[in-house]
Design a protein with these regions (language model features):
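C-terminal output helix
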Residues: 105-114
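Cap/insert and terminal regions of metallo-dependent hydrolase folds
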Residues: 298-392
Length: 405
């Protein structure tokens, strides 16, 4: 890649240049933002790395001026500054920066941070794929026995997390092992049944000052998502309350709506499940990830089958790069589980084929289903898709597996 580095500090300029060229990149440097604004349009770099506090024109002004030029719309801009305030981070985003890295420069993590910010990718990682309750034992080793948690990484954005089942403990461990000045994430709760919220207290980043965490979830009529989370942590149930979290924590109740966070858009849809349950569609730069759990798709022969709802759901997930969806039961298991709020293979395959998604990921497995059972369920789903003439790629992701889009 071709980088254009702007900084009036010669030591910082030299270090950034050394790190970037050492990784095989081409680097152009300027000690003045005025000179940079003059030269960048002609040089067309892939990425500009700019300091903030410079004379005549600061880094925010430079970012704003560059973003006003349509021919530079695809160019990445990363702000590199000793200012660690949240205000400045937000201001950089408002001006059009793709990311913000703080000084002093960490030689061990700088290139990783740059890579995450400038690489146009979305990474989906599975931390828990079972439903209802965690299941330990050898029979669950391949797919894992933790309950729902999926993370989505978007370069330059806070981490997006879907549900807080027991799998979030593994995500917590990963975050705590990664050196960072601060950690930010947005957590989206599908609904407040235990297997989707009861591991919130074990997400260690919540306890660290300087971290910023937002928790979104469906409004339950007279129960806010904040109250639902905090109630399970009252003293008779758990020894730590939400008041002891050190991170800056914000709760937000959701209905069917659209949320926009810079380049990321999150749409919501109410699902067929006891209580209020939301499905989510995360879209960014022409790609999308749909997280649809828990959800019951009744058989077409059942009087409760709602063709309008199925079509509406198909429209919601249409063309998704990956559909992560409740496939709790094999078809022969479903008749005794009707009205439990979960779906079976044939209806999930029909939804994926109807919506022409690119990938179907089976999720929220029944706790009684072992690795061998999930293998059979995957085989049945692939056969069902083939019978429908669908080219949808179908997988059953295991804990720790990741997909890059």
């Amino acid at each position: 890649m071709k980088f254009f580095v702007v900084d009036d500090d010669p030591d910082s300029l030299a270090l950034v240049t050394r790190l970037l060229t050492g990784a095989g990149h081409e680097v152009v440097v300027r000690g003045s933002s005025v000179e940079a604004l003059r030269d960048i349009p002609d040089m067309r770099p892939d990425c500009v790395v700019t300091d903030v506090m410079m004379p005549v024109m600061d880094g925010f002004e430079l970012t704003r001026e560059l973003r006003r030029r349509p021919e530079l719309a695809q160019m990445k801009i990363v702000v590199l500054s000793a200012k660690t305030y949240d205000f400045d981070r937000r201001r950089a985003k408002e001006m059009g920066a793709d990311g913000y890295i703080t000084k002093p420069i960490n030689r061990d993590t700088f290139m990783q941070s740059i890579g995450e910010l400038v690489t146009d990718r979305i990474a989906v990682t599975y931390w828990g794929v079972h439903g209802t309750l965690p299941v330990p034992g050898e029979a669950y080793n391949r797919y894992g026995g933790n309950t729902p948690c999926v993370s989505v990484e978007v370069g330059g954005e806070p981490l997006y997390v879907f549900d807080c089942g027991s799998g979030i403990k593994k995500l917590s461990d990963r975050v705590m092992r990664t050196p960072a000045e601060r950690f930010s994430c947005r957590i989206f709760i599908s609904h407040t049944h235990w297997d989707h919220i009861n591991t919130v207290p074990f997400f260690a980043p919540l306890y660290l000052r300087g971290n910023q965490i937002e928790i979104f979830g469906p409004y339950q009529g007279d129960l806010t998502i904040e109250r639902a989370i905090s109630a399970q942590m009252e003293s008779v149930y758990f020894p730590v309350t939400v008041r002891e979290f050190g991170a800056r924590l914000v709760f937000r109740d959701l209905r069917e709506e659209r949320l926009e966070f810079g380049p990321v858009r999150v749409d919501t849809m109410l699902l067929r499940h006891p209580g209020y349950c939301l499905g989510y569609k995360l879209s960014c730069r022409g790609r999308s990830v749909c997280y649809i759990t828990d959800n019951e798709l009744y058989l077409p022969t059942d009087a409760r089958h709602d063709a309008r709802y199925v079509e509406r759901l198909a429209d919601f997930v249409r063309g998704a790069d990956v559909l992560i969806t409740d496939t709790t039961y094999r078809d022969h298991e479903y008749p005794s589980k009707v009205d439990w709020g979960h779906s079976c293979v044939s209806q999930v395959a029909d939804l994926a084929a109807r919506a022409e998604v690119k990938r179907l990921h089976l999720f929220h497995h029944d706790p009684d289903q072992t690795d061998a059972d999930i293998d059979l369920k995957l085989e049945e789903t692939r056969k069902a898709l083939a019978q429908l003439g669908s080219k949808v790629q179908c997988e059953a992701p295991a804990e720790g597996s990741a997909l890059k889009l």
